[in-house]
């Protein structure tokens, strides 16, 4: 999330917050690339079900601290395409997700606060919905322009269309 201009004329710091799909089943070389990039903290936002089916490759890697915060802890929540199709638009789903998981969102931001100097990777399965909401909140808190926040989210949506098929097959 680095390089965005804020409304005050500053820029968000690079190598601080990294939004990602789940790095499951990645090679040792790619793990090392994440490490060399500076990743020292990981926040995995996936459900328990998702963890079982796609274990996180950076969990237990070197000195990376791994946290699991299930942002779908509410039993009525799902991000599978068939389950969210009844929302008129995704904003209604996101509001419900935030309202239903306030404690989990607080835990995520406490991790950010407790790791002020670490490069933190946060991920869900596709890197779009759960991570997108967190990224929007971080960029908004940093004072970024609304159009940059929307642009950041929109790019992730386009980049992750292929992941939808994988999620449907889970």
Question: For the regions a protein language model found, what residue spans apply to each?
Answer:
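Cys-dependent protein tyrosine phosphatase-like superfamily
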Residues: 1-121, 133-170
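Ser/Thr-glycine-rich phosphate-binding loops at phosphate-binding pockets of nucleotides
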Residues: 126, 130-131
């Amino acid at each position: 999330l680095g390089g965005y201009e804020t409304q005050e004329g500053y820029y968000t710091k690079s190598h601080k917050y990294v939004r990602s799909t789940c790095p499951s089943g990645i090679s040792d070389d790619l793990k090392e690339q994440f490490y060399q990039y500076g990743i020292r903290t990981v926040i995995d936002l996936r459900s328990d079900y998702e963890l079982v089916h796609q274990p996180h490759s950076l969990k237990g890697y070197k000195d990376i601290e791994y946290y699991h915060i299930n942002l779908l802890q509410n039993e009525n929540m799902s991000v599978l395409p068939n389950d969210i199709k009844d929302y008129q638009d995704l904003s209604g789903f996101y509001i419900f997700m935030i309202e239903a998981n306030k404690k989990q969102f607080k835990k995520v931001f406490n991790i950010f606060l407790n790791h002020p100097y670490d490069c933190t990777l946060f991920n869900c399965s596709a890197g779009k919905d759960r991570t997108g909401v967190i990224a929007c909140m971080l960029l908004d808190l940093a004072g970024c322009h609304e159009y940059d926040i929307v642009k950041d989210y929109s790019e992730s949506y386009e980049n992750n269309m292929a992941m939808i098929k994988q999620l449907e097959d889970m």
